[in-house]
Amino acid sequence: MAKCLLLLLLVVLSSLLGLPQALECFQCNRVNASGVCETGGSTCQTQGSQQCFLRRIFENGTLSYGHQGCSQLCIPMKLFNPSVIVEYKCCHDSPLCNKF
């Protein structure tokens, strides 16, 4: 009886503490400028401290292609080159938050 109560207490506490839950993210190695996955898109589940990410590449000011998925290391940033901009976005607030 005491073991059952202890187990129940652990379950309740873990839900109250907001322990990380797996998050579903869009996954595609190449998304075209129209937002269509060209490489057979799917979804992935984050594990541990992973986040969903979205990388978009702009060439001469026009969206060219992108990449989306789950990543252990995701730092939101924009990298600039005279003709290319690479934009990284990270999210972990809702399922499928990395929509292209």
Swiss-Prot record:
Tissue: Expressed in placenta, where it is detected in both fetal tissues (cotyledon and intercotyledon) and maternal tissues (caruncle and intercaruncular endometrium) (at protein level). Expressed in the mesenchyme area of villi in the cotyledon (at protein level). In endometrium, expressed in the luminal epithelium and weakly in the subluminal stroma (at protein level). Detected in trophoblast mononucleate cells (TMCs) (at protein level). Also detected in trophoblast binucleate cells (BNCs). Overall, expression is strongest in fetal tissue and lower in maternal tissue.
One GO CC term, this protein: extracellular space
Pfam families (UniProt xref): UPAR_LY6
InterPro entries noted in UniProt: LY6_UPA_recep-like
Glycan attachment residues as annotated in the record: N60
Signal peptide per UniProt: 1-22
Compartment list: Secreted
Disulfide linkage: C25-C52, C28-C37, C44-C70, C74-C90, C91-C97
GO MF annotation, one: collagen binding
Function in brief: Binds specifically to type I collagen.
The protein's name in its UniProt record: Secreted protein of Ly-6 domain 1
Organism expressing this protein natively: Bos taurus
Lineage: Eukaryota, Metazoa, Chordata, Craniata, Vertebrata
